[in-house]
Regions:
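Conserved Radical SAM active-site core
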Residues: 2-124, 132-134
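Short glycine-enriched, charge-decorated loop/helix-capping segments at active-site entrances
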Residues: 43-49, 138-143, 221-229
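Conserved radical SAM core fold
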Residues: 45, 82, 107-110, 128-146, ...
């Protein structure tokens, strides 16, 4: 089985405890489990960009990123390739891969895929996009987003436990939940953050992202999203 990869490189713009100074070894897989109307990586998420590679080549890419000094291997939207990625990680580890593995995903993840990856993943980096089913239906075609994301996050927490950092402040295991604030959706953001805090307290980290950038050609039907976040 082959996989479609859009990009593999040192990535300097993740959270500081992921990228550090050396960078995160990010592998961007084509395709995504959720269809957000505002996606800033639309061509990748829709599976339109990328190159077909073998499992063996993916294993080599992991090792090449390690050789370049990456702090970790960062699997971006990996769930739909979970069995193949697990095989590639087995191959790479047999050849000396020893970095923490990050699962960087939408939060709208099947437990089946997460279970396949869980033997390898040290750090879970899920999105938690919505509390409201109305918003998740309207903007991501996923009315059950909150329910699915809650189940996925609970599974991740059972696997990862409390966060651990090395002496350089780079996360080695644990969970960082990302939440992207959307224009006009501040109450929903408050509900998401309240839920996460009430459920997990200080057992997880929350990364609140305010860099929403409208992609105008995708948002002609959603004018309320076609501007940046105001202070």
């Amino acid at each position: 089985a082959d996989l479609k990869v859009a990009r593999a490189a040192l990535h300097m713009w993740e959270e500081p405890c992921i990228s550090g100074e050396a960078g995160s070894g990010a592998v961007f897989f084509s395709g995504c489990s959720v269809g957000c109307v505002f996606c800033q990586n639309h061509a990748i998420a829709a599976g339109q960009s990328g190159k077909r590679i073998s499992i063996e080549r993916l294993a080599d890419i992991f090792l090449e990123l390690q050789a370049k000094g990456a702090n970790n291997i960062n699997l971006v939207t990996p769930e739909h390739y979970a069995p193949s990625i697990a095989l590639a990680l087995d191959m790479a580890k047999a050849k000396g891969l020893h970095l923490p593995i990050i699962c960087n995903c939408s939060g709208y993840s099947s437990l089946t895929a997460l279970r396949i990856l869980s033997d390898h993943v040290n750090v879970w980096l899920p999105d938690f996009k919505y509390y409201s089913p109305e918003l998740s239906r309207k903007y991501s075609h996923a009315p059950d987003y909150f329910t699915v994301a809650c189940q996925a996050l609970q599974f991740m927490y059972e696997q990862a436990g409390d966060p651990v950092f090395d002496d350089s402040g780079i996360i080695q295991k644990g969970i960082i939940v990302r939440h992207l604030t959307l224009p006009g959706c501040m109450e929903d953001s408050r509900s998401v953050i309240h839920y996460l805090h009430e459920t997990y307290g200080d057992k997880i980290y929350i990364s609140i992202m305010n860099q929403f950038t409208p992609v105008s050609e995708l948002l002609s039907d959603y004018p309320e999203l076609n501007h940046t976040i105001s202070a």
